[in-house]
């Protein structure tokens, strides 16, 4: 393995909007896309895309968002994945409102990654 990434994986819901909402307003999304995100998963994916071998340590909840990102985590890291499933946890997720010029507004829920303790990590990954 060339690089080990430890941290958040999340389900992202991206919505293309004409402008971000102001308080007490409802706006329409022009287009939506679901994807896998989170700092650690995004960095690991970029590293692997550049030809590196990436390992990933992250956590998900036993929920639908966790099921969504599990396959992406396995694709990114393969056998170099330590994926903690926290039965009472909630998987990290973000709603990202993107304007046509690329400006964005992110609402993020951190999920259960903070429930992982150093003693749980595998010595060899």
Regions found by a protein language model. Give the residues of each.
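Conserved N-terminal subdomain of the carbohydrate kinase-like
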Residues: 25-26, 49-125
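Glycine-rich phosphate/adenosyl-contacting loop at the front of the ribokinase-like
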Residues: 1-59, 64-68
